[in-house]
Amino acid sequence: LQANEAVAEFMCKHEHPTVYRVHENPDPDKLRAFAQFARPFGYRIDPSKPEDTAQFQVVLRGAKNDPKQRVLPTLLLRSLARARYADECIGHYGLKAKFYLHFTSPIRRYPDLIAHRMLQKALTGEEFTAADENMCAEAAQQSTSREQAADNCERDIDKLFIAAYMKQFIGEEFDAEVSGVQS
């Protein structure tokens, strides 16, 4: 984490182009809805203070010990923004980091490789061009898009395996917890 933060801070403060890993503050409406849902369980979430993450830790700890509250961590996660890649340095809410990018795995993630290339360019004194800025913006958008597609594919595969497993239980009844309803 320290390497990721240090490189992000250097690149941001020197206004060099790169691909950042960003995580915006929670959407106030979603956080208010979560606070309302959690209230009957005894939790007092202040949606006007999303930076006070200790209030969320209380919910997570409490939900761990009460089967009736098992849905709360899932709903809390749904109220948060998804992390994404961007060519702007806007910080990472979940890590409480003002500067953040992915740097430590250039053989696994393309954004890390770009960060290495842009840092090398900065350290050797090469001039950055509009093409560098455009490439970072496009790579951020494409990396986020591909990450979301991979997540969707993973969810679909999980559903397929669950359905295949549950096929043997057709006709039986089970208790279930509903964590959301979609129309």
Role assignments for model-derived ranges:
Residues 6, 24, 29, 39-183:
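Structured C-terminal cores of nucleic-acid metabolism proteins
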Residues 11, 36-38:
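Hydrophobic alpha-helix position signal
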